[in-house]
Amino acid sequence: MVSKILFGKKISWLLTIFVLWVIVFVLQKPFFLLFTGEGLSSLYAVLWHGLPLDLSLAGYMTAVPGLLLLLGSLPFHCVHTPFVKRVVSSSYQCWMVLAAVLVSLSFVANIALYPYWQFPLDATPLFYIASSPKDAIASVSYWQLLLGLVAVIGISFLIYSLFKTIGRRFSTTLCQPVSTLPWLFLLVFVAALFLPIRGGWSTSTMNTGKAYFSNHQRLNHAAVNPLFSFMESVTHQEDFSSMYRLMDEQQAHRLVSTMLSSKSEADSTVSSSFLTVQRPDIYLIVLESFSDTLMSVANVTPGLNHLKKEGVYFSNFYANSFRTDRGLLSILYGYPAPATVSLMKYPKKTAALTSMPQLLKQAGWDLQYYYGGDADFTNMRSFLINQGFLQIVEDVDFPVSQRISKWGVPDHLLFQRVKKDLRQTKTSTPILRVIQTSSSHEPFDVPFYRLNDKVLNAFAYTDSCVTDFLKCLRSSPQWNRSLVILLPDHLGAWPLDIDNFSFARYHIPMIWTGGAVRQPQKVDTFASQQDLAATLLGSLGIAHVALPFSKDMFNPAAPHFAFFMMNDGFGLMDAHHGVTYDFKRQQIVHAFGDKQQQYVQAGKAYTQTIFNDIATR
């Protein structure tokens, strides 16, 4: 009986610590809203959407006391000496002091710096302090420093006092042994902190993008836990300005100047003759892992093969990289996604970039995003909201019974939801609907059987889903004003065992179809995913000067080439010349044409320019 009471007290002590940390983090948010002049009208939404990050950080903060509790509860009386008890007790006190200071410092710094930087606390202050402490505080007055110091000390004292009071209530609990079975239960309980820390069992781990919910950035930033944001930034910190220093900046600028669209080209609003409607409804279907080679395999993509003949087929189109997060960046932002880093994980940087959906929204298009998986995977939510996608349909918007694949909802159910929403849409406003498929991805488990090969069968399934969706759209009143754009996020799974440095590794199809397309056409211009944005905007008569890396494939005055990056390498090609280059080996891997060294230098300059641009964001 005594053992059960003791076990209950230990569990209560740990739960109390966890709950108190959550309360501390929740209380930060109204203060942030008030200090930034936002008011409290959206407080409930801020608290609710910020709660997952608060729970995660509370899990981190409770993990150390949890480990100390396990040590102090070991079912071996020989280790429970006065010395061990003092060490455990002192360690707990030291941790609480440190935790209180860290939390208060992040809270005060976030409020103090936000009016100047307009983004949640991250590792940027560390960079400035490390590079020049004097310059870092040069613009701060003495009274501001003093006030900040007083605030940090005061808040630290309040937090520490709160936990010290709780510790006093359970002072005899921490260092008392329990029998083996209760200790094992304690171990399971402490290990369960992994769930709030990680954010559950889903494929995505906890990230700041989880808190994003509003088109008003300040509310998103209010929901973000500042210490969590700082920790995430520190662990993902990259010094982009020092990456890929391959040549003198003047030389790089000279080489790249001919590879970027000029301002006059980007300002061009001459509509393409490919479209019959100036402001069409746009359906952008992002096909998971499809390749151009796949379309030549018998009976796999009969739907796409038919669309290829009746629409506009881009025969020399290439993926910018090899992962979904990179592909989405290139497709939506018109940006050459670097292979060695995922910009989607840096909300501050993607918020500083202009995207094609943003420009469409400014021009009057209504935006909505459909994805059958977890929209918090790799910070996707903040990535989308930063572009203006406030309506995001994801796995949690479907019944649990329909989330039957590893990646969430199968493609046919995703398209059914799109069709349902379209039937209910009554608006004269042009729409942009981005539909991201996921079923043609490992483990390739799909509710469909036509081919013996599991991988090819999954591609055939997605092809059938697209075909059914377009059949439905074709019979609807929306068809005549519809522009449907199909392209993959990257090539994956087929062909098997393809060389990462081969040109074919990045060759993907792009097809434009729909009632708004004037006539079938084959476009042989060499281009990459990054060029879709400028091409689409130019076809709609919308300037794209804010997308300097994107090139209009229909504009004969624009430069035309395909660029892509693999891990620590790049590919650059056009109709006459091409190279893939390995930075690690510092050598050409594949090439054709007689200007190989010129293309290597151009590719190096382009890579250096990309990372220069990232560093400034």
Residue ranges and their predicted role:
Residues H216, A223-F228, E232-V270, Q278, ...:
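The feature marks either
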